[in-house]
UniProtKB/Swiss-Prot annotation:
Superkingdom of origin: Eukaryota
USP domain location: 107-410
Primary role: Recognizes and hydrolyzes the peptide bond at the C-terminal Gly of ubiquitin. Involved in the processing of poly-ubiquitin precursors as well as that of ubiquitinated proteins.
EC number per UniProt: 3.4.19.12
Protein's recorded name: Ubiquitin carboxyl-terminal hydrolase 23
Family of this protein: Belongs to the peptidase C19 family.
Amino acid sequence: MEVATSSTEITIQTDRDPSSNNNGSCAVASSTASAVFRKIEFHPARKPFNGFSNGRSDFKIETLNPCSSNQRLLSAPSAKKPDSSDLLEHGFEPDLTFSITFRKIGAGLQNLGNTCFLNSVLQCLTYTEPLAATLQTAAHQKYCHVAGFCALCAIQKHVRTARQANGRILAPKDLVSNLRCISRNFRNCRQEDAHEYMINLLECMHKCSLPSGVPSESSDAYRRSLVHKIFGGSLRSQVKCEQCSHCSNKFDPFLDLSLDISKADSLQRALSRFTAVELLDNGAKVYQCERCKQKVKAKKQLTVSKAPYVLTVHLKRFEAHRSEKIDRKVDFTSAIDMKPFVSGPHEGNLKYTLYGVLVHYGRSSHSGHYACFVRTSSGMWYSLDDNRVVQVSEKTVFNQKAYMLFYVRDRQNAVPKNSVPVVKKESFATNRASLIVASNIKDQVNGSTVIKECGFGALVANGLAPLKSCGPSTPAVLTQKDLNAKETQNNAISNVEAKEILETENGSAPVKTCDLAAPTVLVQKDLNTKEIFQKEVPLPQANGEGSLVKEDSKAACLILPEKVSPHLDGSANAQTLVKLPTLGPKAENSVEEKNSLNNLNEPANSLKVINVSVGNPPVEKAVLIDQTMGHHLEESATSIESLKLTSERETLTTPKKTRKPKTKTLKVEFKFFKLALGLRKKKVQRRERLSTTVAGEIISEELLSKKRVKYQDTSLIAPSKMISSSDGAVTSDQQQPVGSSDLSEASQNAKRKRESVLLQKEAVNILTRGVPETVVAKWDEEISASQKRGSKSEGASSIGYVADEWDEEYDRGKKKKIRIKEESYRGPNPFQMLASKRQKETKKKWTQSITDAKTAYRI
């Protein structure tokens, strides 16, 4: 095989050996055609690559060299892990090669009593992508040796739970109850400093991540610690003698940079003041020089020797002997370059991107409230104020008076020498590419065919149904249009062409040849003569792992819709449903042609259903032609009793949910073809898995969109019924309306309108008449049936429940309720009658006395 490459195209010459095909099921070309030429042109992707989604986790592939080719391949490259020396050369640890993405905001945190400082710090740590990715993959809980409370296990558990709890509220009880395990200075239900809590929490996590027996402040501990790999850096304190220029360097690890903002109005200015050169003791001779052996004047400078992976900046908003907070605005930007402030050797860039802002509200340094703002991987900012999670604009974030800033180091320009994206294997089980050569005129350049790739997780443009990848013994599907030949062809398909799949294996060229045992299904359409030419080759028994149909399935259904560019004459949709059998003694080639006068007068839209059987069942076919004006239905001369569209669950399905067109079981018979003329295009409903009975119902969308309004009322849908048997065959014992989605949809719309009118009436009744009263029985009576009916008939809406009467004596503890056995009496209660009579007499006397008192007497 010879490969000739250029900047934009690849030409492949493949030599075929007819004797290499042992199955003998594929048609082989003549001996003269010994070489087949391929020409593949690559075009840049139109949409940005967002990475692969792997089930519930959010791992993705990050492109470290965006300047290279924009071509993205769905196939898995060789899983070669980057060399550790290459990563260390650019300042990255080998353990931090993977990152995690937060496309959606997680859960809010409940305030358990002055725990806003804890909630804000936890949210900022949760959305620190390097920390979350490491905690997601690390198996620390299995090998944890800490007796009692482990801060690293608690953070790992919290991060995993918070990422999956979208729209919920979590209570960090484990961290709040063990607050004194973080530091002895903390007390429950007391306001604490967020920066102090974060530093103590990271130190506790640092100790828990070390193996047993390793001191926490040793150089080996800083090198092994997970916390210092992410947040840790090194500061260089340099003292320079004024006389001999001798320099004394001291290196100290740090987890954050505390900057003085008393004389700085921006983050850049604060960093410049932090790394500025200053005189020791205002120029006094207090420094003992090692070379001069005397006390001399000296200068001191602090610089960053080793830049951390995650830079945490603490802005000092307090001063000694001052209770008020420094409430000045310090400007900060979304990106910062630390190169001017780093003195040590470094490779690559030192640019950081802002992802978290922690804010303190209040004028005093002893009290107040904490909240934070975090940025997700999609670039959206969210305000996390305890359990309140709100999306905000970037301008709102930069207007805050920040207390702590969180930056993450960019990895775009740090390119390892032999870097390849490492992908987990299970992510490719459902994202294999299927070879579909699109027949659009726009995609053909200089007569060459552009090979597109489509994943199983998304619908392909132009209405093509996604199929599984071209694996061993898997058919390759080709669709071509605008052929110039006007006569029908009876030649059998030659060697299986177009078996390339866009897949890279072991770093080779991104072209892979399928198994020779896989057939080709080719559909061509001549637009000039409006003739339909079809070639079909039965599919042999497929035993490959990536095959379209497995051994236990009965048949495979391929839907090959064709869509022509709108500027072509006679352009329309021609859709073909082909049933490919997989079981049988031997596959036979069958070429179906149709060249009659009826086909010449075909309208723009046509539906063809072809059943290619192997073995005992005969060959059955049926054609549904939708006339443009009169909606006439032409039926084929061959009588068809049924068309079996049976397949197992694994046929054209994947373990995870994918967008697939909804299909229904179609009874292919003359009287059942009178359907789908007035159907409207349905909206995308909830995605569901295919049932055991796979069916194909292909609807011409362009014709329906034109005639949707015209033929909505006068539909020519013929009612029909069908019943699916247990083995998947379709019987016609009873008749059931098929394709009556217009009627069902209209009835649903009418039902929704009636319900909306009732709801509006109920709302008006509640607003005008008030909430309907509820009749409560007396202490020894029951509600009569008329009263019950009357209370219910006044209004359909109700408050939902009736509260118990308020018993003040019971609430005060002076009275104890005793359950009394309920007894029902048929007649009236004589005691109640007597009490009512006395009450009426008393009321009558009372009203009479009031009336007499108001009467004026003349003196």
